[in-house]
């Protein structure tokens, strides 16, 4: 592989990574804006983030986590 080809490949990889990093930053800002809008309309952002986290869990894991939380709350009288 010639040095020119290697240089071009490296530049392409770097360019793609830079583009994706910018897209990631843009998406992150969009998510932040959505949370701000939801908050302005009276929604609890902390609760929304908890729901998003729970939605990522497997149904069995979620049921297990709910059962454990209920057990701990009962134990502590909460």
From Swiss-Prot:
Family annotation (NCBIfam families): PRK13694.1 (NF010247)
Any one GO MF annotation of this record: DNA binding
Coiled-coil intervals: none
Protein name: UPF0335 protein A1C_00850
A Pfam family it matches: GapR_DNA-bd
Biological classification of the source: Bacteria, Pseudomonadati, Pseudomonadota, Alphaproteobacteria, Rickettsiales
Record InterPro entries: GapR-like (IPR018753), GapR-like_DNA-bd (IPR046367)
Family: Belongs to the UPF0335 family.
